[in-house]
Amino acid sequence: MKTKLFINNAWIDSSDQQTFERIHPVSSDVVTESANATVTDAIKAAQAAEEAFKTWKAVGPSERRRLLLKVADVMESKTPKFIEVMAMEVGASALWAGFNVHASANVFREAASLATQIQGETIPTDKAETLSMTLRQPVGPILSIVPWNGTAVLAARAIAYPLVCGNTVVFKGSEFSPATHALITQCVQEAGLPAGVLNYLNSSPDRSPEIADALISAKEIRRINFTGSTRVGSIIAQKAAQHLKRCLLELGGKSPLIVLDDADIDAAVKAAVFGSFLFQGQICMSTERLIVDEKIADEFVAKFVEKTKRLSAGDPCVTGDCIIGPMVSPNSGERINGLFKDAIDKGAKVVCGGLAQGALMPATILDHVKSDMRIYDEETFGPITVVIRCKGEAEAVRIANDSVYGLSSGVFGRDINRALRVGMSIEYGSVHINGSTVQNEAQAPYGGTKNTGYGRFDGRAVIDEFTEIKWLTIEPFEQQYPF
């Protein structure tokens, strides 16, 4: 597959004609050859977005809604293509890729529904014969930097919400998924959005830092949203702060699933398997910690292992219905093996699976994990999860909160009041009582606490993220002033 940059409604090569390759993590075959953007291209994209903003901000809500609904329809019509491309680029199963397209279409439809919900309010004033009000206005060109793992849906939210609020977008895709991100851009183009409203860039890892620097500092860019690692997100936040530009950051996660002693064990096991191993555990809200009451831990682990061993593994390009595919890079396997070996050396027990071989790793469960093990609090981002045994509700809460991250979580227990008490006590942006940690609905705010970042995608929260609030008064000509 070959892809280009998309600037001002034209698919173009990079200004220096250079390309980079996305290599399959197992076969080492070249999957995609992508145009390799330069700083010159990045500035050109920002300028196109600024020029388009002059007219796009004045487009009425009904027209913005119509166009975003059209994008959703176009995306759904290309579902087979998305499944094919995501399997080749990021090892996505048909299940994960199909969900991504469905969720992405929902994001564009939810965004479309917000077109007439961007509202101000009237404010009581002490000034006679004066009307005081607030308005919500678009902020200008938005820089959206998107990762590879939720390949379609994370791009959709970074595009749709700024657009419905009247902004334009410079979309920086991931070097791991250039064809998928170009396909999303193509959907927006086919829906008929005006030139410059969406501009797409991609670049090799060695060029990406200078391109990000150039865009963050560009006078045309007004706000930034980034989904990715906490390390990179922190760098972006610091650079944005130098230019007094607001960020929305959705970063790392170490999501816990708490299983209380009165839980429905079979239901908890189903949620644990789904949350731990969907897309090889490479989801920011994947279940990386099972915090299980010691009274039921043996039964839970036995059933968890039994169900996990039934998961099918393979190459989605060959076996589309497999659940466990390759990780995005052989480097992932090397990193996880380091965490695995450290845990075993310190007393953890392997109850399912084993070491990774390059980008391939079986669904793996470690039991009896303790706080002195690196895997206790380091993000794994692969098909491995851990069981941490606890004594009672209070210790479960303490362990859940013993993390620098705070994205998603789950609590299983039959006593709903008790489960709710636990849910209110843990420091996470999302808490699901008797549900998996892996959940997302376009109408519900999504984000986290602590090192997971700040700001929220989805739901009405995006209106604050992608608009400016303005105080406006209409006053009588004749007024009394003190001098």
UniProtKB/Swiss-Prot annotation:
Keywords, sorted A to Z: Aromatic hydrocarbons catabolism, NAD, Oxidoreductase, Plasmid
- EC numbers: 1.2.1.65
Positions binding NAD(+) in this chain are 228-233
What positions constitute the catalytic site? 250, 284
**Which cysteines in this chain are paired by disulphide bridges?**
none
Q: In which pathway does it act?
A: Aromatic compound metabolism; naphthalene degradation
- Recorded catalytic activity of this chain's protein: salicylaldehyde + NAD(+) + H2O = salicylate + NADH + 2 H(+)
Q: Name one GO molecular function term.
A: salicylaldehyde dehydrogenase (NAD+) activity
Class in the EC hierarchy, top level: oxidoreductase
Q: Name one GO biological process term.
A: catabolic process
Q: Which InterPro entries match?
A: Ald_DH/histidinol_DH, Ald_DH_C, Ald_DH_CS_GLU, Ald_DH_N, Aldehyde_DH_dom
Lineage top rank: taxon: Bacteria
**CDD domains reported in the protein's UniProt record:** ALDH_SaliADH
Q: What else is known?
A: Encoded on an unnamed 75 kb plasmid.
Family listed:
Belongs to the aldehyde dehydrogenase family.
For this entry, the protein name equals: Salicylaldehyde dehydrogenase
> What species is this protein from?
Pseudomonas sp. (strain C18)
